[in-house]
Each structure stands twice: as structure tokens, then as C-alpha cells.
């Protein structure tokens, strides 16, 4: 509890003890009416002086209609009618509800702060063989910092020395450690688990991943959802309306009674009007709706899903169309050897020859061959390298001529080669003028991609579409394997934007379209869709800037998880609105009819608020979605 909350708690306890004492004494001793009034004023002012002060300032500043005004009028009115206990009790229970709400909101904020506890307090710099702690803001680009086991990585950079495991769970929601060694890029916010590592910084602290993420989460509350805006407007008109309704309830029925010759019953109708005022307090809705979105954004952050505002969370919950980029989203975006079909020599030797022949090339295919070979390249074994544009390469390896390339290269050399029906890039190999076999290289599908498509369907997505610049046979194979509904291949970036616009025109107004890409090459499409989702954005400034929602790792399952989180959050928002307004409507009618007394009014106000706040906090719990 904060100091302010502790003070309120002490006031609540003192006031409650005084009320109980007065009731007990009053049951045994006859107390003079004026003395009783004076005695009850003590707990009343102890518990309610701040509410009365706020109500007075509201009237003074011409901002009359708020919950403080409602409580002040209701309690002063009850006391004026001689209902001292009820007047003080209404103020007491209102303050109990306010304390609970303050504590719950504070707790949810602390939970989110703990979930996103990635802000580093210091950076270690080595000076004369000793580590010195400095403020991360003071560290310049190119400085070598030291991170020891258990410490947070304070600034983005490249590992220059050491090996370690990193806990990235605060960023990605994943508990599996990430291994790093010299030469690997590393981002701020991770926790070093094992070895000491030295990192050469590549950014200033203010531009580091950790700073961008924290700014994003902290600023998310400024972008209001339609539901929040509706509640704000609703409260703006609702509170004056119920005040005037209560005034009418206090005046009109007694006047009608007088006209028809019955006793006016002013006391009865004023009491009903005061009960009406207490019931009508809109706290439950006004507090619980923003709190639900706040908790939902915090829970999503814990799962490695960064949402830039509650408006995006609300839009995401209505997503019916999901369009994907293929490379880096559904596939790893890295070429790998997926098949070796030897003809005259064994597979390992075939890969070795291809890796050596292609070793001077910087093409991704060359890198995949060297990765498959898995050993260092001895450049002294290679000579007479000749690259033939659009065909491949011819080189001498250990004095023997090796040709590695596509079918055009084999045709140029007059060699017959084996056609391969499998989809992928084929690298044909010839050794001393004789066809030796071919290697199949492909962009590998991520292990969770197929499950991700199934999860999207279960989350209510109507259609999945893949957009790619790849050849049609490659694109079709990936789409068929994953169960994607539609696929468009050989697209330029502008073509992708056109396709997104085409689907935007097809869908209904209530249905929303999300585009998922890597956030770097897909910025125009991300900004054109109803919701732009950037995947695998750890360390990618472009992704964080371009998208509405940022997935911190490259697991496609997170797309469905983000949608499920948004649906749960919106469900809680609607539950609170319907529950709070429903209970209040029933109690308002009962209060106007004289069936509900002030104690029922206290439940309709404080009780409903407590239940709604507790329900809102459920939005933090997203682990099992």
C-alpha cells in the first residue's frame, strides 16, 4: 500500500469504530437529537472531508456532475432527513470501494511493471582493469560494456568476447534461453544467465530496443478504444441526467400527491431520490473499462505481444482476414539444403564440391551450401574461379573442374542432367565434364506454422491469404502444406498493397483485416491494413515503427495468441459494461419505487465496482490462451 492508501485505511477504521460505538451507546442510552447529530458528524467528516472538498471545488470550477457531487448530495441529504447512520455508512462504503479500486489499479500497474521489468539500472564499463557502473544514458556508441551473470543487457550491441545463455522471456514470453557467442548481435532487456560477455554498443540507450519497448507500452494507454471513448461520452451525459432525474423524483411525486389531495410525503420521496443518486454513480463502468484494456495490454506484453494502444486491441478482436508475407513469417527466411541427390559420387563429397565451388559467392544459396558442409573452406584448394551470370560458377577444386549452377549451366556445358520434381532451388554439380548430381535448396517452413494456421481458424479467422514474391510452384507448395486458403505469388511490394486493398473492399465494415510481415520490407502494407502486425521484431527499429502490434519473436503461433488475448479483453469489457449497467438499471427502478433502500444502493455502487474491477484484472491472465 502507498502512504496515501494507508491514510485512507486508517480513516476508514476510525470512522467504522466510531459508527459502531455510537450505535452501541445509542441502543442503551437516550441521546439528545442535537448531540446525536454532532457525534455522527465526527465519523462523517473523518471519512468524507476529501469528497466534500472535491464536490465543492467541482461546483466552484463549474464541473459539477461527478461521483464526488453525487456522494456529497446523497449523504448530506440522508443526514438532513435524520438518517445519520445511513448517511455516514454511504460515505464509508464509498471510500472502501475507492480504496479497493486504487489498490487494484496500483497492483495491476505493478504487475505490468514487473512483467516488463527490463529497464537496466546501470552499465558496466571496464576502467584500468576494474568494472565501473555508469548510467546507461552516458554510454556512447562503440563503447565496450561488460555484462556479468544475472545482469540485464543495458544497450543493444555485438558480442566481442565470451559466450553465454540469455533469458529473453521479458521480451518474447519464451522461457527457452538463447545462446550467444562472439560476433552475435544482442539486444537490451535480456538477462545474462551464465558467462561474462563483452558487448560493443551499436546504439545509444535512448534508441535501444528496451527504451523503444518501454515507451511503446507506457504510451499505449493514450490511444483510446471505441469502448473507452463511448464510456467517457456516456459518463459526460449520464451523470447530469441522473442528477436531474433524482431532483424530479424528489419534487414531482409530492406535488402530484398534493394536487390529488394526498399527503405530499416529501421525506419519503427525497429519501428515494438520494438512494437513486447513490445507485447511479458510474464508477464501476468508468474505472473497469480502461483498467480492462490496461491489463490486457500488460498481459499481452508478458506474452511477447506489444500492442501500441487499446484501439488496436479492440480492432484485432474483430479480425476475420489474415494476410501473410511468406518469407520470415511462415518460413524461416533462410535457405537450407533439404535434399542431396547424388549420381556418380557420394552425398558428402557432392556437398563439399558445391561448397568449395560457391565459396567466393555472397549469394544466400552459397551460404546454405557452406552451412551444410559444416567445415572451414581451405581457399588454397580452389583456383580459376569463373562466375557465369544467371547460370552459376565453374572453378577448379584440387585441380579438378567443378561446375555448380542451374540447368542453364548444364545445357551450356552440353551435359544431360536429372530433372527434379521437388519444389525448391536446384544446384546441379558436374565434375570434370561428367554430371555428378544435384542439391535441393529451399526456404524451410517454421515448425509451428501449420499449427498457427489451425489456431487462427479456431480463433475465428475466416480466411488466411499468403502474399509472396516467390515463384508460383514454391508458394503453392507452402500454402498447401500449411492449409492456407489462398495464395498469390510473384508479387512486387506494390502488388501486395493492391491485394490488401482488394480484400479490404471485399470485407464488411465490421470485419477487420490484419497483415503480418517482417516489418522491414512490408511497411507500406502494414500501414494499409486495418491492423499491421510485425513479427520477429527483436532489435528491428523498422518493425516497431511500422506496425500497430509487434510480436517480439518469430513464432507464428503468436498471431493467434494476440487475437485470443484481444478477444478475452474485449469480452471482459463487455461483461463489465452489461453487468454494471444492468445491476444499476434494476436497482434504479427498485429505488424509485421505494423497494431498494440505501443499503441496496451501497451494493449497487461499491459492490458492483469491486466485482467489475476484479473481473477487469482477469485480462492480465493470458498464459493459457
Protein language model features and the residues they cover:
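N-terminal membrane topogenic signal
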Residues: 1-14, 238
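Bilayer-spanning, highly hydrophobic alpha-helical transmembrane segments
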Residues: 16-17, 229-260, 272-293, 574-603
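Membrane-embedded transport module
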Residues: 245, 506-510, 547, 552-625
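Conserved ATP-binding TGD loop and adjacent catalytic N/P-domain core of P-type ATPases
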Residues: 399, 425, 431-575
Amino acid at each position: 500500500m502507498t502512504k496515501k492508501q494507508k491514510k485512507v485505511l486508517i480513516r476508514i477504521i476510525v470512522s467504522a469504530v466510531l459508527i459502531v460505538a455510537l450505535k452501541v451507546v445509542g441502543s442503551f442510552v437516550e441521546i439528545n437529537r442535537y448531540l446525536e447529530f454532532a457525534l455522527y458528524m465526527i465519523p462523517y467528516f473523518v471519512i468524507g472531508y476529501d469528497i466534500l472538498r472535491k464536490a465543492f471545488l467541482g461546483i466552484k470550477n463549474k464541473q459539477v456532475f461527478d461521483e464526488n457531487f453525487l456522494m456529497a448530495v446523497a449523504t448530506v441529504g440522508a443526514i438532513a432527513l435524520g438518517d445519520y447512520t445511513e448517511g455516514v455508512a454511504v460515505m464509508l462504503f464509498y471510500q472502501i470501494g475507492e480504496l479497493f479500486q486504487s489498490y487494484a489499479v496500483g497492483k495491476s500497474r505493478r504487475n505490468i511493471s514487473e512483467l516488463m521489468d527490463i529497464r537496466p539500472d546501470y552499465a558496466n564499463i571496464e576502467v584500468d582493469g576494474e568494472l565501473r557502473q555508469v548510467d546507461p544514458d552516458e554510454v556512447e556508441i562503440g563503447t565496450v560494456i561488460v555484462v556479468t551473470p544475472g545482469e540485464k543487457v543495458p544497450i543493444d550491441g555485438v558480442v566481442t568476447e565470451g559466450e553465454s545463455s540469455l533469458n529473453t522471456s521479458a521480451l518474447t514470453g519464451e522461457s527457452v534461453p538463447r545462446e550467444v557467442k562472439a560476433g552475435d548481435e544482442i539486444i537490451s532487456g535480456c538477462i545474462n544467465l551464465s558467462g561474462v560477455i563483452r558487448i560493443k554498443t551499436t546504439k545509444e540507450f535512448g534508441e535501444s530496443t528496451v527504451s523503444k519497448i518501454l515507451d511503446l507500452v507506457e504510451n499505449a494507454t493514450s490511444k483510446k478504444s471505441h469502448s473507452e471513448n463511448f464510456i467517457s461520452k456516456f459518463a459526460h451525459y449520464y451523470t447530469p441526467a441522473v442528477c436531474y432525474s433524482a431532483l424530479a423524483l424528489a419534487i414531482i411525486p409530492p406535488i402530484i400527491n398534493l394536487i390529488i389531495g394526498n399527503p405530499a410525503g416529501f421525506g419519503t420521496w427525497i429519501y428515494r431520490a438520494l438512494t437513486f443518486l447513490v445507485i447511479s454513480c458510474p464508477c464501476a463502468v468508468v474505472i473497469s473499462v480502461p483498467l480492462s484494456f490496461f491489463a490486457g495490454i500488460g498481459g499481452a506484453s508478458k506474452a511477447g505481444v506489444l500492442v501500441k494502444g487499446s484501439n488496436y486491441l479492440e480492432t484485432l478482436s474483430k479480425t476475420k482476414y489474415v494476410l501473410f508475407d511468406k518469407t520470415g513469417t511462415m518460413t524461416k527466411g533462410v535457405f537450407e539444403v533439404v535434399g542431396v541427390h547424388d549420381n556418380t559420387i557420394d552425398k558428402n563429397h557432392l556437398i563439399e564440391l558445391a561448397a568449395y565451388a560457391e565459396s567466393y559467392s555472397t549469394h544466400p544459396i552459397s551460404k546454405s551450401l557452406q552451412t551444410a558442409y559444416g567445415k572451414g573452406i581451405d581457399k588454397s584448394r580452389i583456383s580459376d574461379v569463373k562466375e557465369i551470370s544467371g547460370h552459376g560458377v565453374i572453378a577448379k577444386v584440387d585441380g579438378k573442374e567443378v561446375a555448380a549452377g542451374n540447368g542453364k549451366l548444364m545445357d551450356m556445358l552440353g551435359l544431360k542432367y536429372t530433372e527434379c520434381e521437388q519444389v525448391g532451388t536446384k544446384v546441379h554439380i558436374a565434375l570434370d565434364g561428367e554430371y555428378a548430381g544435384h542439391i535441393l535448396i529451399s526456404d524451410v517452413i517454421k515448425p509451428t506454422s501449420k499449427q498457427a494456421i489451425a489456431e487462427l481458424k479456431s480463433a475465428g479467422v475466416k480466411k488466411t491469404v499468403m502474399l509472396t514474391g516467390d515463384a508460383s510452384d514454391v508458394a503453392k507448395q507452402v500454402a498447401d502444406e500449411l492449409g492456407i486458403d489462398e495464395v498469390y505469388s510473384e508479387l512486387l511490394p506494390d502488388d501486395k498493397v493492391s491485394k490488401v486493398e482488394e480484400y479490404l473492399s471485399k470485407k464488411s465494415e465490421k470485419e477487420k483485416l490484419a497483415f503480418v510481415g517482417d516489418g522491414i520490407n512490408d511497411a507500406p502494407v502494414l500501414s494499409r491494413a486495418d491492423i499491421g502486425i510485425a513479427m520477429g521484431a527483436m532489435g528491428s527499429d523498422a518493425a516497431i515503427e511500422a506496425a500497430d502490434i509487434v510480436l517480439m519473436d518469430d513464432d507464428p503461433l503468436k498471431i493467434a495468441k494476440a487475437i485470443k488475448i484481444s478477444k478475452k479483453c474485449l469480452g471482459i469489457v463487455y461483461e463489465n459494461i452489461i453487468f454494471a449497467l444492468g445491476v444499476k438499471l434494476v436497482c434504479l427502478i427498485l429505488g424509485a419505487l421505494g423497494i431498494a433502500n440505501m443499503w441496496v444502493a451501497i451494493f449497487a455502487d461499491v459492490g458492483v465496482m469491486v466485482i467489475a474491477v476484479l473481473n477487469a484484472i482477469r485480462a492480465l491472465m493470458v498464459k493459457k490462451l
